[in-house]
From Swiss-Prot:
It is found in: Cytoplasm; Nucleus. It comes from Candida albicans (strain SC5314 / ATCC MYA-2876). The lineage of its organism: Eukaryota, Fungi, Dikarya, Ascomycota, Saccharomycotina. The active site is at 280 (proton donor). HAMAP family: Salvage_MtnA. GO terms for cellular component: cytoplasm; nucleus. Belongs to the eIF-2B alpha/beta/delta subunits family. MtnA subfamily. This is Methylthioribose-1-phosphate isomerase.
Length: 416
């Protein structure tokens, strides 16, 4: 199924006909196309290939794929009966598609928990199906509601922070990867906070002495989710933004925060006051696994917050809060520190090649090409995620009205 109309709906689930489609995010922003997910194997491939990505979204797709597979099985009249053990084996297999993101494992383990009341040799029937269906629907609906709460809570934290700093005037926010509607059931986590903040704090409607002027999404190499997906969402929402490469962050922040320096080819100079990121796993002490490059952003924020630059007259402009935004389902209290998080490594060709459509001089989209950008046969290290130490995180915003901040000892208390 294809459409020429842009949409921010990453997951389409037909609750009446039990059909699941996902937006193929590998084709964005040049083509909007939905692909069917007919079973668990389809979901595994789509998640592994990153046709769907974002910790909340892959959990939802994983759960819905189980619903679709069981529904299709129950419609069959053949004698190939599936047992609880068969389904548990399929769930364990699906978990391995993206090991770092805890949401997928949590959702599928919840389904496994539903199955524990049955014997492994029991045949899957309508009662089991209805329980799985109800769980998946609740997962989707709660994620959407929680994302909106994350946006509201993040907005309040931003207002409180800037008010406490007695900050006035325009400010900017920086983010990495994609954490919006394309990574969730809707609205988003980190991008959801940005969306909520822009709605409330535009220059022409802000009730505060400050307003959100600009967003800086990082390109997010090597998969370019920031360039392809976050810009797609920001453009759709008509939120002012400028795309930057991952290695431009320090220079941009320094330039924007100094009144004596004028940005080159940037028509505004609102200082970056917040770096807001998502999370694929937050462990008990607050260490956070997120898209590769997140750790780097936290160290840059820490540099500007503690460096000698803060003795200047523009010290307030250089104070940057590093915020992690995620639903509480992303918090893993069974893992003590970030050292224990399994980091997924991606194929070398994702770093040594670029994949995208051929564009002619008029910008018309042509065939998809793979272009080499590195010496063939070289050694490549390509982790999908890194771990940001809790020491470098200022706050963790969830759907809980209480924003998690550190105590006087610099420790988070993330007990749900």
């Amino acid at each position: 199924m294809s459409t020429t109309t842009r949409t921010l709906q990453a997951i389409k689930f037909d609750r009446d006909n039990i059909k699941l489609e996902i937006l193929d995010q590998l084709l964005l922003p040049y083509s909007t196309s939905y692909i069917p997910i007919n079973n668990i194997e389809d979901a595994f491939k789509a998640i592994k290939l990153m046709q769907v990505r974002g910790a909340p979204a892959i959990a939802i797709v994983g759960a819905f794929s189980v619903v679709v597979e069981v529904s299709n099985y129950l419609k069959q009249s053949d004698s190939n009966q599936k047992t609880i053990k068969n389904l548990n084996d399929s769930l364990n297999y699906l978990i391995t598609s993206r090991p770092t993101a805890v949401n997928l494992a949590n959702a599928l383990n919840d389904i496994k928990q539903l199955l524990q009341k049955y014997n492994e040799t029991d045949i899957i029937g309508e009662k089991i199906y209805q329980q799985i269906y109800d769980y998946a629907i609740t997962l989707y609906d709660e994620d959407l509601a929680n994302n909106k709460k994350i946006g509201e809570n993040g907005l309040k934290y931003i207002i409180d922070t800037l008010t406490e700093q007695n900050f006035k005037g325009p400010f900017s926010i920086m983010t990495i990867c994609n954490t919006g509607s394309l990574a969730t059931s809707g609205h988003g986590t980190a991008l959801g906070i940005i969306r909520s903040t822009y709605q409330a704090l535009q220059k022409n409607n802000s009730k505060q002495d400050f307003w959100l002027d600009h967003i800086y999404p990082c390109e997010t190499r090597p998969y370019n989710q920031g360039a392809k997906l976050t810009t797609y969402e920001l453009d759709y929402e008509q939120i002012p933004f400028t795309l930057i490469c991952d290695n431009m962050v320090s220079s941009l922040i320094n330039t924007l925060s100094d009144d004596n320096k004028k940005p080159i080819k940037i028509d505004q100079s609102a200082p970056v006051k917040f770096i807001i990121v998502g999370a694929d796993r937050i462990v008990e002490n607050g260490d956070t696994a997120n898209k590769i490059g997140t750790f780097q952003l936290s160290t840059i924020a820490n540099f500007f917050n503690t460096n000698r630059f803060n003795t200047t007259a523009t010290a307030t402009n250089k104070q940057i809060k590093f915020i992690v935004a995620a639903p509480k389902t992303t918090i893993d209290l069974n893992t003590k520190t970030g050292d224990d998080i399994v980091i997924e490594e991606r194929p070398a060709n994702e770093l040594t090649t670029l994949v995208g459509p051929l564009l002619n001089e008029s910008g018309k989209v042509g065939e998809k090409l793979t272009v080499g950008i590195a010496t063939p046969g070289i050694s490549v290290w390509n982790p999908a995620f890194d771990v940001t130490p809790h020491e470098l995180i200022d706050s963790i915003v969830t759907e809980d009205p209480h924003v998690f901040t550190k105590d006087k000892n610099g420790e988070f208390n993330l007990i749900k």
